[in-house]
Amino acid sequence: MFIKGVILSSYGVNGYARVKSISNNFCDFINLKNNKVLLKKSNSSSVEVKVVDVNIKGNSLFLKFEEIDTPEAVRPLIGFELWVDDSLASSLKEGEYYLGKLIGYAIVNNNKKLGEVVAFFEYLNSVFLEVRVGIKFFFIPFLSIYIGDINTQEKTIELKVLDLLK
């Protein structure tokens, strides 16, 4: 499952939710129509809903969920993340990766395992991989100057700059 967006507010009088896209690609949201998604929020329960309509107006994205027909019904869902099945995740271009799928990958250099990706975080316009080496943790910028080949078959990520693990 992948997070695809976050509910920001209600919109209109018919129960539409204004959604922020995580991927910034609105076109992929069209595929959600007539599919079920999972709405999740930390420290709260999750709810499965069916998307019955997708509406894109300018730079805004609106979703209509089955049996949610008023702004009042949408308001408790504000802040919920929209999770979708892998088959409905945004398509990737060559060289793009779902960061969550990189968790568990080995960090290697010259085919020697140095550590393992345990998490990632995004800060401003940068992504960092959190890597465990023994009992220590390091943050590696997810940039081509530091990261080399990513082998999805062997689940390895080449580290070009070993000094990042000191």
Curated annotation (Swiss-Prot):
Signal peptide: none annotated. It is found in: Cytoplasm. One of its GO terms (biological process) is rRNA processing. One of its GO terms (molecular function) is ribosome binding. Residues 94-166 form the PRC barrel domain. InterPro entries: PRC-brl_dom, PRC_barrel-like_sf, RimM, RimM_N, RimM_N_sf, Transl_B-barrel_sf. The keyword Cytoplasm applies. Gene3D superfamilies: PRC-barrel domain, RimM. It holds the Pfam family PRC. GO terms for cellular component: cytoplasm; ribosome. Keywords: Chaperone, Cytoplasm, Ribosome biogenesis, rRNA processing. The keyword Cytoplasm applies. Binds ribosomal protein uS19. Belongs to the RimM family. The PRC barrel domain binds ribosomal protein uS19. An accessory protein needed during the final step in the assembly of 30S ribosomal subunit, possibly for assembly of the head region. Essential for efficient processing of 16S rRNA. May be needed both before and after RbfA during the maturation of 16S rRNA. It has affinity for free ribosomal 30S subunits but not for 70S ribosomes. This is Ribosome maturation factor RimM. It comes from Borreliella burgdorferi (strain ATCC 35210 / DSM 4680 / CIP 102532 / B31).
